[in-house]
Amino acid sequence: MKKFICDVCGYIYDPAVGDPDNGVEPGTEFKDIPDDWVCPLCGVDKSQFSETE
């Protein structure tokens, strides 16, 4: 599964970890995160994330 980085603050979304504090279970791919999810650090939406290694 691919990781995605927030272009604003540098937060890295790792699908293996998810974002359980915000309702995203481990194992959830970025494309499967709800559209209303926002970066847990800076609050921008999914459109502000880019694929990373």
From Swiss-Prot:
It comes from Clostridium perfringens (strain 13 / Type A). Binds 1 Fe(3+) ion per subunit. Its cofactor is Fe(3+). Residues 1-53 form the Rubredoxin-like domain. CDD domains: rubredoxin (cd00730). Keywords: Electron transport, Iron, Metal-binding, Transport. Fe cation binds at residues 6, 9, 39, 42. One of its GO terms (biological process) is alkane catabolic process. This is Rubredoxin-2. Gene3D superfamilies: 2.20.28.10. Rubredoxin is a small nonheme, iron protein lacking acid-labile sulfide. Its single Fe, chelated to 4 Cys, functions as an electron acceptor and may also stabilize the conformation of the molecule. GO terms for molecular function: electron transfer activity; iron ion binding. The keyword Iron applies. Belongs to the rubredoxin family.
